[in-house]
């Protein structure tokens, strides 16, 4: 068979000649890649913005699209800015630092609109706060390269780790902790025994959890504990055979005037100020009264349940992790709320009997990225007046909302929640009303 001429080399075993070419960027993907076309084929270009002409290197070829990396911007967009972080080009933590913040929000809003195009929604509202130094939690990898101890995040589209000097989206306190930890790692001989570290800031202070791949000596552990005390952080060790660390220290944060305790390895929203705004908006949209019985699904340690309990007649929180349910019960007790009940249940399975006995009037759910599709058949049988859906994955929210609409609900309000500025992550809140 003759080879075709005038076309890009065909893919073979994922290996092909890498080539560089000029492209005119027409759009932007949900993960912040520029969209161009070459001979009718779509090209996704890392680091390119709409309206730009760039010189890009095609690094991956597929049947439906190719992937490329910007090498030089020939005609620059007026929306382009110099990234504040020196590691932006390599680090996979942020995707949008080269785009002015208002246009970041606009891009996410347009993407949400595309995801919800079948739902007949109105305008998408915006809930936002400051765009830097917001992240109160982070997980970083530790490794040794060329005899140098390094720490950082995964590189873009790679399993490689980028060694970073600091991270500007961390809270200012955690930025200081990060710098101190990096210096300590350079002085330590334990780097080869450390898999990763987790940084956390809450109302009790800053903490570091070190995940060990191999055991360390009592002397080394003692030296690290002395260092942690001098730096002013709480230090936890997680051995390779431990799934959960033990801690006598109380970790907590405030929301809606309530004290929420949690285990340092359990889920909490990483953006504290946006979490406060999100809960306030949820209470305003759902507007529970003493006449309401509210069901809070995937309730965690009570982030929504407890504010709901301050307003509703009765609240029932359901969570899959027993450890988080225990904290939720403790939080209800510590905040003197006796009209809220928590149960542990797998929400991918038939509803527990206690749910079937309740005449639920309103529902709030905040599921993982996979959504809540398995529970929706049960949910619509409750016939709640309103359903407030908080989502970290717009595609599964759109899927679940389609089911709810087909079963008697209409979309009342939708909001983009800017939990992760400088990144391509878009969180959403949707209120559905029963017809």
Swiss-Prot record:
Domain of life: Bacteria
NCBIfam families, per the entry: PRK13168.1 (NF009639), rumA (TIGR00479)
Organism: Marinomonas mediterranea (strain ATCC 700492 / JCM 21426 / NBRC 103028 / MMB-1)
A biological process from GO: rRNA base methylation
Keyword Chloroplast: no
UniProt EC number: 2.1.1.190
Alphabetic keyword roster: 4Fe-4S, Iron, Iron-sulfur, Metal-binding, Methyltransferase, rRNA processing, S-adenosyl-L-methionine, Transferase
The keyword Repressor is annotated on this UniProt entry: no
PROSITE patterns, A to Z: SAM_MT_RNA_M5U, TRAM, TRMA_1
Matching Pfam families: TRAM (PF01938), tRNA_U5-meth_tr (PF05958)
Enzyme class per UniProt: transferase
Gene that encodes it: rlmD
Binding-site positions, S-adenosyl-L-methionine: 269, 298, 303, 319, 346, 366
Family as reported in the entry's similarity comment: Belongs to the class I-like SAM-binding methyltransferase superfamily. RNA M5U methyltransferase family. RlmD subfamily.
Protein name, per record: 23S rRNA (uracil(1939)-C(5))-methyltransferase RlmD
CDD domains the record matches: AdoMet_MTases
Its biological purpose: Catalyzes the formation of 5-methyl-uridine at position 1939 (m5U1939) in 23S rRNA.
Active site: 392 (nucleophile)
Residues reported to bind [4Fe-4S] cluster: 85, 91, 94, 167
Domain TRAM, chain residue ranges per copy: 10-72
Reaction it catalyzes: uridine(1939) in 23S rRNA + S-adenosyl-L-methionine = 5-methyluridine(1939) in 23S rRNA + S-adenosyl-L-homocysteine + H(+)
Any GO MF annotation of the entry: rRNA (uridine-C5-)-methyltransferase activity
